[in-house]
Amino acid sequence: MTSHRSQSKATVQVRPPPSFIEGVQDKSWTPTPENWLYGSWYMTHTSQQYYWERTKNFVIQYAPVMNGVWPCTNQELVSLTPLSQPERIYTAFGIDSPVAGLDDAWLCQCTGHLSHISDHVAFLAWGADSKNVDWVVLYSTPLPGATVGLPAQVAIMSRERFGPDNSMVEAIKEAFCAAGDSDLTKLVDNLRPLLQEDLESGRPTCEYHVVQNVDSLTRF
């Protein structure tokens, strides 16, 4: 989806990670348009070392759980391939519930075999590159006191498999570094490209074994 033209390089707008517990909205934040997030997003850059060292073809598919008053509860289907198992696709399925008082922020609760894993997730920036391809910066962090899961990360995702152009990526990084949040700057400084290949096969669908996380990405 490339229909929404947004911030140019000179006007990349960012926000620090919101306070998920207090639910205090950053007044300068411009929410994404209704239904804008739905569909497939290719993760092209991530600060999560586990991902850029060990995986490729990381995709997140968002869809509404049901039609209703916006913001809706969404389903999230993650798929990726381990570098060590290039013929395999692993998945993780979860339900994203909006965080009260915040735009573009959710509590992601995994299901089935991964029901013990939850994260807070939020969009920290969004827009379109010079080719009018939509991109978004995703932030995810474990819940306070969590003993399982991966540490906090930022990631750039795009509607196109190979991501926003290099000038857009640099503009995004510069905007976050200029925001003055030291913890966020450390994550942004650790952003690395994530391998995306031009695949002909389709993505996984939400069949029963996928929803139950029977063959989840935590098992490789």
Stretches found by the model and what they are:
Residues 1-220:
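A beta-rich soluble binding module of mature secreted/lumenal proteins
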